Amino acid sequence: MNKAIILLIVIFMTNSVNAQEKIQNINFLFANNGYGFGYEYEKFQKSNVSIGLDLRFYDVRNDEYPIYDPFYNQFTVAGEKDILLFPLFFKTNYYLFDGQIANSFRPYVTFSIGPFIAVDGDETISSFAKKWRSTESQTNLGASLGFGVNFSQPSGNTLSLGLGYDHLSVDKPIHSKDDFGGGYLLLKYQINRE
């Protein structure tokens, strides 16, 4: 797996030397296993193809549910697990219908691959700082496939809405679960364009 990661980094670096346009985005992700946010950097190789880097943070929350305690008249969370995922994906976007429709509406297909780190915090410790001192983590290979639409704003910034699927499987199960992938909804806001 280390050779594959090194190969991806070399390909990314050599292909990005002649890039014409660079874009940075902030992403908000709503997945069936939780929620997250991310940072995205893309460089256009052609007018309809870009490559880049996609850094994400997921807080896994799918097995939790509220329980009402009538004695204290409060809700508590049952099944709480402190699992964090940190994907580092190398991505490519292919923009459909380049030059055929108005520039303010740009559909695209995206594919990403790379390592991700899964971190399991100790749920028995209530202190946030102490909880993350004694963690178990593992690194695995993940991938993502999706599609979306960029909407250009008159100010020059771009908003994007997309749907996709993450493949995030771990080698050693965490809380008897080995697949943290699934569908996601992506909201993207462009923060910089060079």
Report each predicted region and the residues it spans.
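Short glycine/proline- and aromatic-enriched beta-strand/turn motifs that initiate or cap beta-hairpins
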Residues: V17-D59, Q190-E194
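Surface-exposed strand-loop-strand hairpins of Gram-negative outer-membrane beta-barrel proteins
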Residues: F30-E40, Y65-P66, K131, T135-Q138
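Sec-dependent N-terminal signal peptides
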Residues: A4-T14
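Outer-membrane beta-barrel transmembrane domain signature
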Residues: L88, N93-E194
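Gram-negative (and chloroplast) outer-membrane scaffold detector with strong preference
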Residues: K43-S127
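Short structured motifs
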Residues: K22-Q24, F75-V77, G146
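Generic marker of residues within folded, mature protein domains
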Residues: I9, N18, L29, K43, ...
